[in-house]
Amino acid sequence: MKLQIKPPNNFAEFVGKQEIINQIQLSIKASRINKAQLDHILLYGPPGVGKTTLARLIASEMNTKLQIIQGGHLQRPSDFLNAVSLIKKGDVLFVDEIHAVAPSVMELMFPVMDDFRVQVLIGKDFNSKMVEMKVNPFTWIGATTQFGKIINPLEDRFGMILNIDYYSNQEIERIVSIYGEQMELELKPEEITQITQHSKQTPRIAIRIVKRLFEQKIVNKKIDLAALFKSLMIYKNGLQSIDVQYLKALNGQYEPQGIKSICSMLGIDKSTVENKIEPFLLRENMIQKTKKGRIITRTGRNYLTSC
């Protein structure tokens, strides 16, 4: 029998974030009783913590369809109008990385979020006219890894704003245990702990390690976490090669470094540095942001010495 990772099918199977789950379930029940459309929801937090999974479970709980679109794909009014024209009453529209939606499209989004209608320009030049387009009522779920880029007029239109943050070690251990059982890995408690310690408190990374561990087992007939972490270039505390390169780049400087200098030293883009590398290093107090730029902390230097 082919073994594969099975994502949660309902809120009961979703590990962690119980207060957020309770709030969502309460709102769904209230909307049913009131026979009203569920309020729009904004989910924000780092990558890999379950924002898309929550959107899927919300749609499932509401017994409706989930439509998914990337914010970066909404760059022209026609992109948005095509998307909402396909929505049926009660559907859930999930816009991932909603901060990437073009400003011209956001102007159309606001009236749709308010009362499900939008003014559309039909025709050209002297023959053009504004026509009101009605949209079927739906629930809008936006997700972002860059909450600071969400403009106030957009933020104000969400009835629920939920922070999906990093997970506790206990929650990650539970996730590793569940998926390890699905893959019949028979993980020992110390192995679960090791995987947790190398997961950056992020479910997506933990699940990725479990998948690679399964591959290792079916090929080599045994589990060797040390060899796996080495092959994946995952270091202590879950830091990856690019994270260590970042720390080494700062460690070799005598003055704070600006984001442009760091990008130049690493050869990667600003968005990757700010959204994929720095959040966890800041959380672990390995780096600090100052007015003059980024600096490595004593914790960061000690990490480089030990890894």
Swiss-Prot record:
DNA binds at residues 289, 294. Mg(2+) binds at residue 52. Signal peptide: none annotated. GO terms for biological process: DNA recombination; DNA repair. It catalyses: ATP + H2O = ADP + phosphate + H(+). Keywords: ATP-binding, Cytoplasm, DNA damage, DNA recombination, DNA repair, DNA-binding, Hydrolase, Nucleotide-binding. Residues 236-307 are annotated as: Head domain (RuvB-H). Its EC number is 3.6.4.-. Residues 168-233 are annotated as: Small ATPAse domain (RuvB-S). It is an enzyme of class 3 (hydrolase). One of its GO terms (molecular function) is four-way junction DNA binding. One of its GO terms (cellular component) is Holliday junction resolvase complex. Its main location: cytoplasm. It is found in: Cytoplasm. The RuvA-RuvB-RuvC complex processes Holliday junction (HJ) DNA during genetic recombination and DNA repair, while the RuvA-RuvB complex plays an important role in the rescue of blocked DNA replication forks via replication fork reversal (RFR). RuvA specifically binds to HJ cruciform DNA, conferring on it an open structure. The RuvB hexamer acts as an ATP-dependent pump, pulling dsDNA into and through the RuvAB complex. RuvB forms 2 homohexamers on either side of HJ DNA bound by 1 or 2 RuvA tetramers; 4 subunits per hexamer contact DNA at a time. Homohexamer. Forms an RuvA(8)-RuvB(12)-Holliday junction (HJ) complex. HJ DNA is sandwiched between 2 RuvA tetramers; dsDNA enters through RuvA and exits via RuvB. An RuvB hexamer assembles on each DNA strand where it exits the tetramer. Each RuvB hexamer is contacted by two RuvA subunits (via domain III) on 2 adjacent RuvB subunits; this complex drives branch migration. In the full resolvosome a probable DNA-RuvA(4)-RuvB(12)-RuvC(2) complex forms which resolves the HJ. Has 3 domains, the large (RuvB-L) and small ATPase (RuvB-S) domains and the C-terminal head (RuvB-H) domain. The head domain binds DNA, while the ATPase domains jointly bind ATP, ADP or are empty depending on the state of the subunit in the translocation cycle. During a single DNA translocation step the structure of each domain remains the same, but their relative positions change. NCBIfam families: PRK00080.1, ruvB. Belongs to the RuvB family. This is Holliday junction branch migration complex subunit RuvB. It comes from Mycoplasma pneumoniae (strain ATCC 29342 / M129 / Subtype 1) (Mycoplasmoides pneumoniae). The lineage of its organism: Bacteria, Bacillati, Mycoplasmatota, Mycoplasmoidales, Mycoplasmoidaceae.
